[in-house]
């Protein structure tokens, strides 16, 4: 989260530094809220579709060969990829 704020600050200073003083840019960044990814099922499905995974079991979907995933009644396996689960569920780092 700190990296996002620093990136936003640098972008603000770079873009608005010649119009606004740096102190005003820092004040804007300190008041601004960091946007949070949605946690609804729609947003989970959207993120899963963007990386080609099932939003319920985190397997590759559509399956390459015979798979336990039908995208309706599937369940997560014993050890799903934690990075994929974190991305699909929208958990922050």
Curated annotation (Swiss-Prot):
UniProt keywords, alphabetically: DNA-binding, Host-virus interaction, Inhibition of host innate immune response by virus, Metal-binding, Suppressor of RNA silencing, Viral immunoevasion, Zinc, Zinc-finger
InterPro entries: Carla-bd
Zinc finger (C4-type): 54-69
GO process terms (BP): regulation of DNA-templated transcription; symbiont-mediated suppression of host innate immune response
The keyword Transcription regulation belongs to this UniProt entry's keyword annotation: no
A GO term, aspect molecular function: zinc ion binding
Region span, Basic: 44-47
Source taxon at top rank: Viruses
Its job: Suppressor of viral-induced RNA silencing. The potential mechanism of action is based on sequestering siRNAs.
Family: Belongs to the carlaviruses nucleic acid-binding protein family.
Name recorded for this polypeptide: RNA silencing suppressor
Organism: Potato virus S (strain Peruvian)
């Amino acid at each position: 989260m700190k990296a996002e704020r620093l990136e936003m600050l640098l972008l603000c200073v770079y873009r608005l530094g010649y119009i606004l003083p740096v102190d005003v840019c820092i004040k804007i960044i300190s008041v601004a809220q960091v946007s949070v990814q949605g946690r609804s099922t729609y947003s989970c499905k959207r993120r899963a579709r963007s990386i080609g995974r099932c939003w319920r079991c985190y397997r590759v979907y559509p399956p390459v060969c015979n798979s336990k995933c039908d995208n309706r009644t599937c369940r997560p396996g014993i050890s799903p990829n934690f990075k994929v689960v974190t991305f699909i569920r929208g958990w922050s780092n």
